[in-house]
A protein has these predicted regions:
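An acidic-aromatic
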Residues: 67-114, 179
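Positively charged n-region of N-terminal signal peptides that target proteins for export
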Residues: 1-2
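Beta-turn initiation residues at beta-strand->coil junctions
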Residues: 53, 78-79, 96, 170-173
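Solvent-exposed strand-loop boundary residues in beta-sheet-rich modules
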Residues: 57, 97-99, 175
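N-terminal leader/targeting segments and the immediate start of mature chains
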Residues: 19-61, 71-74, 201-212
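Flexible, surface-exposed loop/linker segments and immediately adjacent secondary-structure boundaries
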Residues: 106-137
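Bacterial N-terminal signal peptides
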Residues: 7-18
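Gly/Pro-enriched, hydrophobic low-complexity segments
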Residues: 125-127, 134-212
């Protein structure tokens, strides 16, 4: 279950990645900030991150570090023990802990959380967007699901006021667990097309879990 939580939220970060923003004298609205990120998504980006998972009581369960690549509708995210990929059609991931390779066709509902492009392009119909009280240095935008889904119930994303770049993503889950992702660095980068090709043969001895 923990792995599912990490995958669901970490890949959501792809929608924040393209915001390699420049300083502006006028703060954009929450919706225009999202629209700008959607437009920049297809250019490709690389993000490094660290994250902490907390249980419903607030106790920290685990920490992770990883990297996420995006290009258009595609993304690749790697963090121990997961290597996950979406090639625009199929979503797959390898779990090094149990040596399983899972592949599926995600539904539009799945993609609203998993796929950055779909999340942004459908955010108005899938989420209610509201700006919360921020700090002197950051703005906080809340995304609340219009329709109940199995895992994530809401997301809060912090943006630096000076650059409009995302700095933190907090995911709240139905069971009260909370995942906090801190963005370490953002780089504008065009990944190779090979980055978004993932096959079971790359993981010798793995067990196939085909959910297609």
């Amino acid at each position: 279950k923990r792995i599912a939580l990490w995958v669901a939220l970490l890949v959501f970060m792809g929608c924040m990645l393209p915001s390699v923003a420049t300083a502006q004298t006028k703060q954009p609205t929450a919706q225009s900030l999202i629209n700008t990120m959607a437009q920049r998504l297809e250019k490709g980006a690389k993000i490094t991150f660290s994250g902490e998972l907390f249980d419903a009581s607030g106790a920290r369960i685990e920490t992770k570090k990883g990297v996420l690549y995006t290009l258009g509708k595609k993304f690749r995210v790697r963090y121990n023990p997961i290597d996950a990929n979406y090639n625009g059609r199929e979503f797959s991931f390898y779990n090094a802990e149990d040596r399983t390779y899972t592949i599926m066709y995600p539904s539009m509902e799945d993609l609203a959380i998993l796929n950055p492009f779909v999340f942004l392009s459908s955010s108005a119909s899938v989420y209610n967007i509201k700006e919360l009280s921020g700090t002197k240095t950051s703005r906080i935008i809340a995304f609340t699901l219009r329709k109940k889904m199995e895992n994530i119930t809401s997301l809060e994303v912090s943006f630096l006021r000076k650059t409009n770049a995302p700095s933190q993503i907090v995911g709240i889950f139905a069971d009260g667990m909370r995942l906090v992702i801190n963005i370490t660095s953002i780089e504008g980068e065009t990944p190779s097309s090979q980055m978004f090709i993932q096959q079971q043969s790359s993981y010798p001895g793995s067990e196939l879990v085909d959910l297609r």
